[in-house]
Amino acid sequence: MMETLSTMDILPVSTTIALLLTQTTMSDKLFLWVEQYRPKTIEECILPDSTKKVFEGFLKQGEIPNLLLSGGAGVGKTTVAKALCNQLGSDILVINGSDEGRFLETVRNTCKVYASTVSLTSKARHKVILIDEADNTTPDVQLLLRALVEEFQKNCRFIFTCNYKNKIIAPLHSRCSVIDFQTPSAEKPQIARAFFTRIKDILDIEKIKYEEKVVAAVVQKFYPDFRRT
């Protein structure tokens, strides 16, 4: 029997919106839709045209520079980083800057072991280390990362994501291509409509009935944080 989402379902909003796009599967496996439906390619990512063209350019070149991706929560920084690696066929190591990324020795040992080895299966020119939420790492960890970027430049690329780029030390800025995930005002309606359509597509796939005005309310409430919708 199909579930129907109605206007009453968004009361209280904080609870119902969380339920709208977060689903526990019938097989008792907890599976967040944000992961299940995460875009696998840059083409699938909902981005301003100018930003998407930058990443498409990297794909045409067949490699990426060191990147610093900056923008608010849920705008697609991590998704873009993973999509780039997926399309380039790059091995990727993810380190969470809010967790293990705060410990100097952990970062040093993990990165060195990974970056100093050559992949036997990947056809990409470089391996990738993704430092997610890099603005939550400590200053000494950032100084270490600066050194690692230089030490392993022939074999490895680094992608840093952050909400606040002012919390990233200048030496890392200068060693990366900095890309701001900001949507020009003129493109905001287009981006919101694209995500509105994406949500409806997901609900249709999951066979969940819905009212369009409820989906629109979700997008309007949390835009541009798409992860929360």
Question: What are the language-model segments listed below?
Answer:
Residues 222-229:
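The conserved phosphate-sensing helix
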Residues 198-203:
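Conserved phosphate-handling catalytic cores of large alpha/beta enzymes
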